[in-house]
């Protein structure tokens, strides 16, 4: 089999071996040499870190104020109960968060199947043990908040945002949202006709039961394809930053000379020379102003001092003066 150097083999055989409802092996072959590790490592990382799922994030247990306590009639302490609740495999349809409840009395184990929930919630491991009640008079009641998310979010990451509103007795739980429990891959040799240097990728995956292994592979491949799609067309798609339009002139130059609060004599002399704006004034030199009728050295000194207090001076050069907004007036 000899193809173009620009053509790459695509897997023609995809085999899914369903070991159990939560365990599957997916085999893809043939792959070009090296592509087994390239694709296997990328899919493995996505499956571990980027699969959305649901997890317990908050718990309220009747009669319990903090996690470092115990409850009468319950074999486990509160920390151990919270640890067991982290192992709940919950699937929620159509909602980002739900509240489920657990009420149990009498001696014996308390399991996930004892939890009360509506039709939007499915518990994939109903036999999962949460705690044990030690006598017939013992009882436990709790409200459990389940949220949708991705990856791992420790409870400490939510303390600063929720502490002010969180009432006493509401316990935070580290949330592991990923439905994938274990994932590994192996690359084996594959052969197509005379070629014996090809790869076969075998992905071995276990989930918590809320996500089918085949669907997990499909989602991971979709995420990878969407991320790589940006590299197909390398045009610069950045939104150009809007540059702030700097005014052509300092706003103070556009203000009328009346704003300088000069004496009546000085102000009248400037108006007689058609000097209406501060921008008009700063372009005049001392010699030019002294030629103005009735404007003497005392008035000149006043004008210079007032301009200096505003960071201006006489004899300035202003390109493109006057601006259109003034010229139209």
Swiss-Prot record:
SMART domains: RPOLD
Region span, Alpha N-terminal domain (alpha-NTD): 1-235
CDD domains per the UniProt record, alphabetical: RNAP_alpha_NTD (cd06928)
Enzyme class: transferase
Tree of life domain: Bacteria
Single Gene Ontology BP annotation: DNA-templated transcription
Record's catalysed reaction(s): RNA(n) + a ribonucleoside 5'-triphosphate = RNA(n+1) + diphosphate
Subunit structure of this chain's protein: Homodimer. The RNAP catalytic core consists of 2 alpha, 1 beta, 1 beta' and 1 omega subunit. When a sigma factor is associated with the core the holoenzyme is formed, which can initiate transcription.
Domain remark from Swiss-Prot or TrEMBL: The N-terminal domain is essential for RNAP assembly and basal transcription, whereas the C-terminal domain is involved in interaction with transcriptional regulators and with upstream promoter elements.
Family classification: Belongs to the RNA polymerase alpha chain family.
Listed name of the protein: DNA-directed RNA polymerase subunit alpha
Gene (UniProt): rpoA
């Amino acid at each position: 089999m000899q193809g173009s150097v620009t053509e790459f083999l695509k897997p023609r055989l995809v085999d899914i071996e369903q070991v159990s409802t939560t365990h599957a092996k997916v085999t893809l072959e043939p792959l070009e040499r090296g592509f087994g590790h390239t694709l296997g490592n990328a899919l493995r990382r996505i499956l571990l870190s980027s699969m959305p799922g649901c997890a317990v994030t908050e718990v309220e247990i009747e009669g319990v104020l903090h996690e470092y306590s115990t409850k009468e009639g319950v074999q486990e302490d509160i920390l151990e109960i919270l640890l067991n609740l982290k192992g709940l495999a919950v699937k929620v349809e159509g909602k980002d968060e739900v509240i489920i409840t657990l009420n149990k009395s009498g001696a014996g184990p308390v399991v996930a199947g004892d939890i009360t929930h509506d039709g939007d919630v499915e518990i994939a491991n109903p036999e999962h043990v949460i705690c044990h009640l030690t006598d017939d008079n013992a009882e436990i009641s709790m409200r459990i908040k389940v949220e949708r998310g991705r990856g791992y979010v420790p409870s400490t990451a939510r303390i600063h945002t929720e502490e002010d509103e969180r009432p006493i007795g509401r316990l935070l739980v580290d949330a592991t949202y990923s439905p994938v429990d274990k994932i590994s891959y192996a690359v084996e040799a594959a052969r197509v006709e005379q070629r014996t240097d090809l790869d076969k990728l075998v992905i071995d995956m276990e989930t918590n039961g809320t996500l089918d292994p085949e669907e997990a592979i499909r989602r991971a491949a979709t995420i990878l394809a969407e991320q790589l799609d940006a590299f197909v067309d390398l045009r610069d798609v950045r939104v150009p930053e809007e540059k702030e339009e700097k005014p052509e002139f300092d706003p103070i130059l556009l203000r009328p000379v009346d704003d300088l609060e000069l004496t009546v004599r000085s102000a009248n002399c400037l108006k007689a020379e058609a000097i209406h704006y501060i921008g008009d004034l700063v372009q005049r030199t001392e010699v030019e102003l002294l030629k103005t009728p009735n404007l003497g050295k005392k008035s000149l000194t006043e004008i210079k001092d007032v301009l200096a207090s505003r960071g201006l001076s006489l004899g300035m050069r202003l390109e493109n003066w006057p601006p259109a907004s003034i010229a139209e007036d």
